[in-house]
Regions:
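Beta-rich carbohydrate-recognition and catalytic domains
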Residues: 1-25, 30-195
Length: 195
């Protein structure tokens, strides 16, 4: 369900997006350079004979009327969040199968995503992410769960344009639901769930 508010206090339903053959999860809204609302999420398929998850996007000019779904990214890679930087959309998808890795995608239109870095990180079980940009620098806050004896601590990644080479700093704590935003005074604000 998409909610809208004119004051941030009182909310009303603007739209309901459903799927007869999947469970829709973890919706996030961003705004494209053309001013469209872009709703991204994943579907957990009821029939998992071909794949278990797909990433999806819908578009709207007003928040009330939404396009049909667009399948984005690769099968079984969950694009956790899409972030626009200039005219390019970036998203990091995590493997829902056995590979236990994350992949960095880019898109010019938000409808067709191509891998920019096939294996962005692959130690432990990396999954949920938030990516922000400051000029030609990208920052990524990455959740990592314990897997095959590898630590489950979060990581902070830093990269310079064209964002194909990354350096990672271990944060020393397990995190969930990472998100980062730039606030008006120029500071970077990060929020996570601690375990």
């Amino acid at each position: 369900r998409v909610l809208s508010s004119t004051d941030g206090v009182t909310w009303e339903s603007a739209a309901l997006i459903t799927s007869p053959d999947s469970d829709l999860r973890d919706a996030k809204i961003t705004v494209t350079p053309q001013g469209e609302l872009m709703l991204c999420g994943a579907e957990a398929l009821h029939d998992r004979s071909q794949m278990s998850h797909r990433s999806l996007a819908w578009f709207s000019a007003d928040g009330y009327h939404w396009s049909e779904k667009h399948i984005i990214g690769d099968p079984n890679f969950w694009l956790w969040r899409v972030t626009w930087h200039g005219d390019m959309a970036y998203g990091i998808g995590y493997d829902c199968g056995e590979q236990r890795s994350v992949r960095l995608y880019k898109s010019l239109d938000g409808r067709t995503f191509e891998p920019l870095v096939e294996r962005l990180f692959g130690e432990g079980y990396p999954n949920e992410t938030s990516i922000v940009f400051h000029g030609d620098t990208a920052y990524c806050l990455l959740r990592r769960d314990p897997y095959q004896g590898v630590s489950g601590t979060g990581l902070l990644g830093i990269s310079q344009s064209p964002f194909t080479q990354w350096q990672w700093k271990d944060l020393g704590v397990q995190i969930g639901g990472p998100h980062m935003i730039w606030i008006p005074d120029g500071r970077l604000l990060a929020a996570v769930r601690l375990y």
